[in-house]
A protein has these predicted regions:
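Active-site neighborhoods and metal-handling regions in enzymes and metal-associated proteins
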Residues: 1-375
């Protein structure tokens, strides 16, 4: 695998952000042995830090991704020869090789085929391996959620007229890095008219009195494990209409959360949500796909399982049964089509044998009013 998150899952090695896209590191994990790691920086730096990988940390074999145009590329074949040699060493040359996490998978498969090695698609194997979290993983995710709560608190404290969406993103990210976050995506921050229709970015719009502001602490990683948690705030006193929209969104998300436990299917959970895209004023599920959805989370922002109204409406898609140890993010949006505001909420939920546990603890039951000088 060349996938940074799967490399970390298998070996504990953290691939830094600049090195992720170039694919200078990979792991070979034999079915009858321990993993071998190729890294793009100095092995001497990491060997003392990773005693569990003793004798199995290898120097860079070259950067094939920027240059390879076909399967005969000599640098690409450095990796093919290295893997082939290890397969021979472990006596597994007749086994299939699962490939994962490279943009040049077709070239690798062709090069391995010439050596008599059959390749298969490896991503689902790793997805399934990571889908159920251990107690250690869950505890790390609790810490990540606590860090996200600090970020949301920093955002709430900063909301006032004149502050821009990008300022709120900066406040949230600063709080995360103060707590040792090792990576984060840019927070989603939409305000006022930007909250309807739903969007997931941020800009330099200035917050004004009466605006709703929704913020997603998404992709914040502690020891690699991520969060994805939306909250909606109001700059000043909220109107009754805004409070009603918020309550509608809260009821929608928690009606689904209350269904969660091991043995329930994703389709049963989604059955708690609107049964037609017309609810939001649209004609097709594709137009409203993000408005009531869910996804697993862990070392990636989007682990299995996926709860998608589009997938559910697609003929032949089978339901997924929830299992204890899954961590799922559920997210909903409400607002009138063509309206001037919208509400977004999201919770991180641990699936348990007898129910669920909401891991995200930042207050959610009522619309939080920020900058209220007239109380």
């Amino acid at each position: 695998t060349f996938d940074p998150d799967n490399i970390r899952y298998i070996t504990g090695f953290y691939v830094t952000t600049p090195m992720r896209m170039v694919e200078g590191q990979c792991v070979f994990f034999p079915v009858n042995g321990e993993p071998h790691l190729v890294i793009a920086d100095l092995p001497a730096r990491h060997i003392p830090r990773m005693p569990w990988m003793e004798g199995r940390i290898h120097a860079l074999l070259g950067f094939y991704k920027p240059t390879a145009v076909d399967s005969y590329d000599p640098v690409l074949n450095n990796y093919v020869d290295w893997v082939g040699g290890l397969m021979a060493e472990y006596g597994i040359t007749n086994e299939k090789l699962a490939l994962d996490g490279t943009a040049l998978q077709m070239l690798f498969a062709d090069a391995f085929h010439r050596k008599g090695i059959e390749c298969i698609h490896g991503k689902p194997i790793m997805d399934w391996a990571r889908m159920i979290k251990s107690e250690d993983e869950i505890n790390i995710m609790r810490i990540a959620c606590a860090n996200a709560e600090k970020a949301h608190a920093a955002v709430a404290a900063a909301i006032r007229p004149g502050v821009k969406e990008c300022d709120l993103v900066a406040a949230g990210i600063a709080a995360l890095y103060e707590e040792g976050c090792d990576h984060t995506e840019d927070l989603v921050c939409m305000s006022g008219p930007n909250t309807n229709p739903y969007g997931l970015t941020f800009g330099d719009r200035m917050i004004r009195p009466g605006d709703l502001v929704y913020v997603d602490v998404d992709g914040d990683a502690f020891l690699g494990y991520r969060t994805c948690i939306y909250r909606t705030f109001c700059c000043g006193k909220a109107t009754q209409e805004q409070k009603d929209t918020y309550q509608e969104c809260y009821d929608m998300i928690y009606s689904a959360i209350h269904k969660i436990k091991a043995g329930v299917t994703d389709h049963e959970v989604m059955a708690e949500w609107p049964d037609s895209p017309h609810y939001w004023g649209y004609d097709t599920w594709g137009e409203v796909a993000p408005l009531a959805t869910g996804h697993g989370i862990g070392l990636t922002l989007h682990d299995r399982p996926f709860l998608s109204c589009v997938n559910r409406a697609t003929p032949g898609v089978k339901p997924t049964t929830l299992e204890a140890g899954m961590v799922i993010c559920l997210e909903t949006w409400t607002g009138k089509k063509g309206g001037d505001h919208g509400v977004r909420l999201e919770e991180m939920v641990l699936v348990k044998e007898d129910g669920y546990e909401v891991l995200s603890k930042f207050p959610v039951k009522e619309l939080m009013e920020c900058w209220v000088p007239y109380n």
